[in-house]
Amino acid sequence: MLNIMVCCANGAGTSLMMKMTADKVVKALNIKVGKMHHCSLSEGKSAATQYDIVFCPLNFIDMFRDAEKKGTRVIGLKNVLSKDEMEQKLKESGMI
């Protein structure tokens, strides 16, 4: 089971839509998810190590380097609402 977090700048509208997209992707790929959480980048930065995968906008990926060093897979997205991009990058991550 994977624990997934999705982050955007403010943690309100966009991260909720990202979470809904991620829900569709994991369902389509038949991935078992323990916890799926959406939040702001500041909350995400401090909580990232509690998750297996973090999705965030590509331009904020550097904020999560410490979490990556501790084993969290951080996936930056160019189009944060693209189901296809999220699915492709999830497959490329080696986590599934």
Label every PLM stretch briefly.
Residues 41, 58-62:
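Short, polar loop motifs at secondary-structure junctions
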Residues 68-71:
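Short, structured coil segments at secondary-structure junctions
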Residues 47-49:
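A short, aliphatic-rich alpha-helical micro-motif
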Residues 52:
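Conserved acidic residues
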Residues 73-96:
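Ser/Thr/Gly-rich flexible loops in soluble cytosolic domains mediating phosphotransfer, phosphorylation
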Residues 2-41:
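Conserved active-site segments centered on acidic
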Residues 38, 56, 75-77:
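Structural signal for conserved beta-strand scaffold positions within catalytic alpha/beta enzyme cores
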Residues 14, 63-64:
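Glycine/Thr-rich phosphate-binding loops of Rossmann-like dinucleotide-binding domains
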